[in-house]
Design a protein with these regions (language model features):
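Surface-exposed binding/hinge segments that line
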Residues: 58, 126, 162-210
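Alpha-helical secondary-structure segments
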Residues: 64, 140-147, 179-185, 229-230, ...
């Protein structure tokens, strides 16, 4: 399960390019940027001369997208799990070895082909020979090997390092056969190609001498990234905008240069302001408007709304270390005493669906019947609490256990997130009806995450939060007992059968053989109830009517960015 923060968990920028919002990029005094950016300019000049703009109305012009969050750590692939940043790494500035088609099946991208040996222990990629870094240097197998070595090196601190658990780390795990061939070694496991869909390849010739622990602070990520993808980096103004230029030399076999001459990503922290900018025409694509803004976009002249089932799900995670929450019956009672369908309808306004586990509706193992889902049933919730030894012993309406501990819980949510505030407030009202006292508490996101993720702290009962799931669902980092002292294992779940099922699912290659195991996993997870799952969101996009080539699905908001175009009439 990939933990992606956009727009869920903001991470502090550690290599800012300007001290104030919108300040010009500071590259003049940075030796790395001073060296590489002139080479990028020369590459662009030569590429434009060799590949002039085609005489087609779709080519040229500027398109502006906007959303509320920065691209945390920018193009430094190995130091961020930010959703917006990884989308730009995959689809805008850099390239992955493979991507997914509309049916979520692997297809060639930087790698033109691959094969795996019979026992699934060696995977060989064959790279395209026509992909250049934006300084004119060819992309080779050495870049792939370098990126892999850094991704599997614990000194790097790669947030998605668990994705590579079943690969052989370090130099023993990768071999450069020639400039266009690289072999990696692995242990047989499910969906072994999926990590290569998300890991954009970095330039070894620019970063190979940088110590793994220094990559986070390196200017490459935020000041002067040199990619090899369809768009060339031009400028970053901190907390304001990123500007990219279409790459004239992007391979014809991959569609050639993008239609757009200039692509701009803007940061507009206030969603009301962002909506007004879309309606006024100063923004072409508003990424992830709130559901309560959808109707305004639909009703306004010149704009349209696009929606698709997506991968983020919202939940309240429970700290099972607390005496009030240690018994799974209490956690099940909490979920059954909460009308999650009412919550989803009130918040999503029809743009989403109730969640019951980490398996998203687009996942191949998703059960459309949701056989193990807990229904809204306050009577059964009361019975479970009685059975667990929690009764109202003093008549004040709040249950206690035999030691006199009140069934009182505090739910944290992050400042500025109205949806999670509403969830906590609705739970406060509904759980009171079964004898549970709830106190919502708002915190700044960084402070909240410090409490929840730090094994030395974890002074909390429940937390309203969200994850963006990946196509390869592996909940080991969330619920495996071995991860209870790791940042994402904050629930402290200890269930031997759940551990066994997660270990088994990770290595079953055949999907049909895995289906019954997934079913049992969902059943046990429902009984354990480490999270009260609320809903999967649809991704919404507000778009100007005259923007062409736009499509949206669970792969991401920028999956079709190479095909976006604007008419000549407004250039």
């Amino acid at each position: 399960m990939k933990k992606a923060w956009f727009p869920l968990l903001p991470v502090l920028l550690t290599a800012c390019v300007g001290g104030e919002r919108g300040a010009p990029p500071v590259v003049a005094n940075d030796p790395f940027c001073q060296e590489v950016m002139p080479r990028v300019e020369a590459f662009l000049e030569g590429a434009r001369a060799e590949h002039p703009l085609p005489d087609d109305e779709r080519y040229g012009g500027t398109l502006v997208t906007a959303t509320i969050g920065e691209l945390t750590q920018g193009m430094m692939v190995l130091t961020t799990a930010d959703h917006g940043a990884t989308q730009h790494q995959q689809f805008v500035n850099l390239m992955t070895l493979l991507d997914y088609d509309e049916a979520f099946q692997p297809r060639p991208y930087l790698a033109e082909s691959w094969e795996v040996n019979d026992d699934l222990t060696e995977l060989t990629f064959h790279l395209r020979g026509d992909v250049l870094w934006h300084d004119g240097t060819p992309t080779t197998a050495r870049d792939v090997a370098f990126t892999y070595l850094r991704a599997t090196d614990p000194r790097t601190g790669f947030p998605n390092a668990p994705y590579w658990t079943h690969y052989v780390p370090g130099p023993e795990g990768v071999e450069v056969v020639d400039d266009r061939t690289v072999k990696v070694r692995l242990h047989p496991h499910a969906d072994y190609l999926d990590p290569w869909r998300t890991l954009a390849i970095l330039p070894e010739h620019l970063l190979g001498e940088v110590a793994p622990e220094l990559l986070r602070e390196h200017p490459y990520g935020l000041r002067c990234p040199v990619g090899n993808g369809p768009f060339v980096f031009r400028e970053h103004r901190d907390q304001d905008r990123w500007t990219f230029t279409g790459n004239p030399a992007f391979p014809e076999g991959l569609g050639g240069r993008p239609y757009l001459e200039t692509y701009v990503y803007r940061v507009v922290p206030d969603q009301s302001t962002l909506l007004n900018e879309l309606l006024a025409g100063s923004v072409d694509v508003y990424v992830a408007p709130r559901p309560d803004q959808a109707q305004q976009i639909l009703d306004a002249p010149g704009t349209r709304l696009v929606s698709a089932p997506f991968r983020d799900f919202v939940f309240v995670g429970w700290n099972a270390r607390r005496p009030q929450l240690a018994d799974a019956r209490v956690r099940r009672a909490i979920t059954m005493a909460t009308d999650r369908h009412q919550v989803a309808e009130a918040i999503l306004l029809g743009y989403g669906r109730v969640a019951n586990s980490t398996l998203m509706p687009v996942h191949w193992a998703y059960d459309p019947e949701q056989r193990f889902a807990l229904s809204y049933d306050p009577a059964t919730a009361r019975a479970l609490l009685d059975e667990a030894g929690w009764t109202d012993r003093d008549g004040d309406g709040v249950r206690e256990n035999g030691d006199g501990v009140r069934l009182s819980i505090e739910i944290l949510y992050n400042q500025g997130n109205q949806a999670r505030k509403r969830i906590a407030e609705i739970m406060q009202v509904q759980l009171r009806e079964v004898g549970i006292e709830v106190t919502p508490r708002v915190l700044e996101m960084g402070a909240l995450w410090d409490i929840v993720s730090n094994p030395a702290d974890r002074d909390f009962d429940g937390v309203a939060i969200a994850w963006v799931g990946e196509f390869r669902v592996d909940d080991t980092g969330l619920f495996h007992s071995s991860q209870a002292d790791e940042p994402f294992g904050f629930t402290g779940t200890h269930n031997p059968e759940l551990d066994h099922l997660m270990d088994t699912l990770a290595v079953i290659v055949d999907r049909e053989a895995a289906r019954p195991v997934w079913a049992r996993y969902e059943e046990v997870l429902t009984d354990e109830q480490p999270y009260t799952f609320f809903y999967f969101l649809d991704r919404l996009m507000g778009i100007r009517d005259d923007v062409g080539g736009f499509s949206l699905d669970a792969r991401g908001e920028w999956v079709s960015v190479r095909d976006w175009w604007v008419p000549r009439s407004r250039r």
